[in-house]
From Swiss-Prot:
Gene Ontology MF, one: melatonin receptor activity
Tissue specificity remark: Expressed in optic tectum, neostriatum, hypothalamus, thalamus and pineal gland, less in cerebellum and retina.
Places the protein is found: Cell membrane
Domain of life assignment: Eukaryota
Protein's name in the database: Melatonin receptor type 1C
Function: High affinity receptor for melatonin. The activity of this receptor is mediated by pertussis toxin sensitive G proteins that inhibits adenylate cyclase activity.
Region described as Disordered: 326-346
Natural source organism: Gallus gallus
Intrachain S-S bonds: 97-174
Keywords per UniProt: Cell membrane, Disulfide bond, G-protein coupled receptor, Glycoprotein, Membrane, Receptor, Transducer, Transmembrane, Transmembrane helix
A GO-annotated cellular component: nucleoplasm
GO biological process: G protein-coupled receptor signaling pathway; negative regulation of D-glucose import; negative regulation of glycolytic process
């Protein structure tokens, strides 16, 4: 799905080469910031959901799953990329190269599949509210999470058979080489990027249409209201989707163009654009936790509590929330009728 061409395989030898020293320093700085924010931010997300009953609902199980996908790259592939930058080449051997490439793909495909699952969850919650509690009870939600990750693993395993996980010195990464097989690369981009984004777009368009319809009905009879907080909660996950598309779109479309006609297209793509598209994609893994903190009041308050309690670590695992749902039960679904208010929760 994710990666344009690569310059060669890693067979255990030292592979050198890459951008100039100044550019490499900039890439290292971006990656260090990404790793720090990724680890701290997504740890805050997971702790927030574990600690606060108000955040424990079916929708946020997918948010935690998305955070896990973002954490995967920060704890293994990104540090290896940093090492390659500092050594001006890959020195960790073929096994680490293959594992790094696999985990990178697992994280990216896991992210887009979880974003798709979140969109479907929001769509069912808003547009099919009467059936939401049955569709997204705890048991079903856990099954959906397992299905999401199973599909993710199935999607990435073929890379080993195609031989597409290779080291690319331009980006100091072991990654998916789009030029190995044109048909496979096109399939990967379509199935792992275009189709999920199309599903997400459909779900959010349907939600927007319903919200607009409810607003118009409010103006007509003055009996309904959609709270600003409800709209912000929906917008949080919409912004997560938009940022993912913006960060990963250039890399996918460059890779798709290169795979269709490598000899004609690849020479016309500047190396700086290729490298920039990659590190834009890498940077995306640290953004989601920041978005939750900026746009969702419950997450923001819990972030503050956790940060203030770092002086007393034992308090981190004490549930301080009051009210809300018990355990991980689904919240009551809103009925969107002429006499009911549309509730939109994260």
């Amino acid at each position: 799905m994710e990666r344009p061409g690569s310059n060669g395989s890693c067979s255990g030898c030292r592979l050198e080469g890459g951008p100039a020293a100044r550019a490499a320093s900039g890439l290292a700085a971006v990656l260090i910031v990404t790793i720090v924010v990724d680890v701290l931010g997504n740890a805050l997300v997971i702790l927030s959901v574990l600690r606060n009953k108000k955040l424990r609902n079916a929708g946020n199980i997918f948010v935690v799953s998305l955070s896990v996908a973002d954490l995967v790259v920060a704890v293994y592939p990104y540090p290896l990329i940093l090492s390659a930058i500092f050594h001006n080449g890959w020195t960790m051997g073929n096994i680490h190269c293959q594992i790094s490439g696999f985990l990178m793909g697992l994280s990216v495909i896991g992210s887009i599949f979880n974003i798709t699952a979140i969109a479907i969850n929001r769509y069912c919650y808003i547009c099919h509210s009467l059936r939401y509690d049955k569709l997204f009870n705890l048991k079903n939600t856990c099954c959906y999470i397992c299905l999401t990750w199973t599909l993710t693993v199935v999607a990435i395993v073929p890379n080993f058979f195609v031989g597409s996980l290779q080291y690319d010195p331009r980006i100091y990464s072991c990654t998916f080489a789009q030029t190995v097989s044109t048909s496979y690369t096109i399939t990967v981009v379509v199935v792992h990027f275009i189709v999920p984004l199309s599903i997400v777009t459909f779900c959010y368009l349907r939600i927007w249409i319903l919200v607009i319809q409810v607003k118009h009905r409010v103006r007509q009879d003055c009996k309904q209201k959609i709270r600003a907080a409800d709209i912000r909660n929906f917008l949080t996950m919409f912004v997560v989707f938009v940022l993912f598309a913006v960060c990963w779109g250039p890399l996918n479309f460059i890779g798709l163009a290169v795979s269709i006609n490598p000899s004609k297209v690849q020479p016309h793509i500047p190396e700086w654009l290729f490298v920039l598209s990659y590190f834009m994609a890498y940077f995306n893994s640290c953004l989601n936790a920041v978005i939750y903190g900026l746009l969702n009041q419950n997450f923001r308050k819990e972030y503050k509590r956790i940060l203030l309690m770092l002086r007393t670590p034992r308090l981190l695992f004490i549930d301080v929330s009051k009210g809300g749902t018990e355990g991980l039960k689904s919240k009551p679904s809103p009925a969107v009728t002429n006499n009911n208010q549309a509730e939109i929760h994260l």
